[in-house]
UniProtKB/Swiss-Prot annotation:
The lineage of its organism: Bacteria, Pseudomonadati, Pseudomonadota, Gammaproteobacteria, Candidatus Palibaumannia. Belongs to the bacterial ribosomal protein bL32 family. Keywords: Ribonucleoprotein, Ribosomal protein. Coiled coil: none annotated. This is Large ribosomal subunit protein bL32. One of its GO terms (cellular component) is large ribosomal subunit. One of its GO terms (molecular function) is structural constituent of ribosome. One of its GO terms (biological process) is translation. PANTHER family: 50S RIBOSOMAL PROTEIN L32, LARGE RIBOSOMAL SUBUNIT PROTEIN BL32.
Length: 56
């Protein structure tokens, strides 16, 4: 089993954890329907980039 030679410093620990923060997802507003949606996803109405993609 691997055992570390020396205790990692607070600086090294912080540098390792620098990318662990949670990021908020980007929300977009459709220009036709005005609904919010995730980027590169269709709205609940079936619109994508101003065009009707899905029929209900």
């Amino acid at each position: 089993m691997a055992v570390q030679q020396n205790k990692p410093s607070r600086s090294k620990r912080g540098m390792r954890r620098a990318h662990d923060a949670l990021k908020t997802s980007t929300i977009s507003v459709d220009k036709t329907s005005g609904k919010t949606h995730l980027r590169h996803h269709i709205t609940t109405d079936g619109f994508y980039r101003g065009y009707k993609i899905l029929k209900k």
